[in-house]
Structure formats: C-alpha cells, structure tokens
C-alpha cells in the first residue's frame, strides 16, 4: 500500500533531529527546474509564485541564487512544517512508525516530483499548480508527465490519496483500469452532503498518516477504522474510489 500526501508551503532546515537517508529519485529533473528558475528575473519569478508578497518573493529570489541541492539537507518528513505535518507529528513516531512511512508514504512535490520521507531536501517555493512553463513545457504537470505515476505504481500497489486535488492531478490522468486509487474525504455533513473544509482536512490528513503509521495499517479495512479527532467512517457515502469520513461534533 502507498499513501500520497501534498507538501506544505512552510518549510524548515533541521539537520539534527533525524538524518536523511537518500537523495530524491528525480534530482536531475529538480536541477533542471532550478536552472530554469535561476534564468528568470525577479519580476518573472514573482508571477510564477502568484499569491506571494513582494517581501516574501524577494526573500525566495535571493535564496534561489544560493540553493545547493546536496548540502544541509533535511528529511522531507520534517522539512515541511504546515498544518498537516504538525498533526502528523513525525518527530514522536516510534522506530516502527518511521519505517512504515519510509516504506509506504510518498510526498508529491512540484519541485522534487515524488519524495520518500527520508529523502534529503532543502526549502523551496514552487507549487505543482504554479504557472511554471519549465524549459518549454506548458506547466509542471506537463513537465513531470507520466513519471510520477509510473514511480508510484511501479509495484502495482494500492494507493490511498490524502493529497489535495492540485497534487492528485499529477497522477490521476494516467490511471489505468487495473490501478487501485482511493481518495479519502474528511468533512461535515451539511444538508445530506459531506462538505470538506481545507483547514480541517489538513488536520485530519495528518492525523490519518499518524494513525496508519502507529497501527502499521496495510489494508482498506484498516484505513476505515480511523476515528481520531471525532471522525467516523461513512460506509453509505463511500465508494470503491472514495472513503468518506464524517466529523461528528
């Protein structure tokens, strides 16, 4: 079983808490992206980053010029510090939990492609949905093409998606009939329908990863037992492609 999650905008450098094990699988492609980004002016990069203040854009522009993809690396699982990762709390995982996520969890990334938890990375700013026509490609979805799909499904695993639509779109266009891809929905029931709110969903996704790791879950039935934070599985609203979890207040 493989679990996919999105990265986070907020990141840190932490070379002390955990040691990285490998370099990312698609490091050459990352170097290509970095080279393209360095060829852009500040104004051009600011447009790529979109909804980003001038102060933050300048900070990232200056950082970009000195980025070294092979020095001062942080394991991806603790490099990202957004809400999902805070609720995941990988720093308190047991050894078994850390081994579980290394084997089963994959982080999708516009900059790195696909990451194992202990791949060594550095802070960057580039979302999969950002307007980045790298080296003549239309956007990052076009740049990565089928590569991330093939890496994810190379062992024909069941894939549980805890990723946002922005990152799922790097995988779903390439799914074949035999592929098993199941999306998890976390929300509240409003007028008979489950409505998902971004902040609560990020918290639930982090809790789900922690639950899966702590309990060494390898089956769909195990995933359905998730009940952290007041959620319960709704069999009646779920399908073969979607597991729905309702927040019960």
Curated annotation (Swiss-Prot):
Belongs to the UPF0246 family. This is UPF0246 protein Lreu_0493. It holds the Pfam family H2O2_YaaD. It comes from Limosilactobacillus reuteri (strain DSM 20016) (Lactobacillus reuteri). GO terms for biological process: response to hydroperoxide. PANTHER family: PEROXIDE STRESS RESISTANCE PROTEIN YAAA (PTHR30283:SF4), PEROXIDE STRESS RESPONSE PROTEIN YAAA (PTHR30283). It comes from the Bacteria. GO terms for cellular component: cytosol. InterPro entries: YaaA (IPR005583).
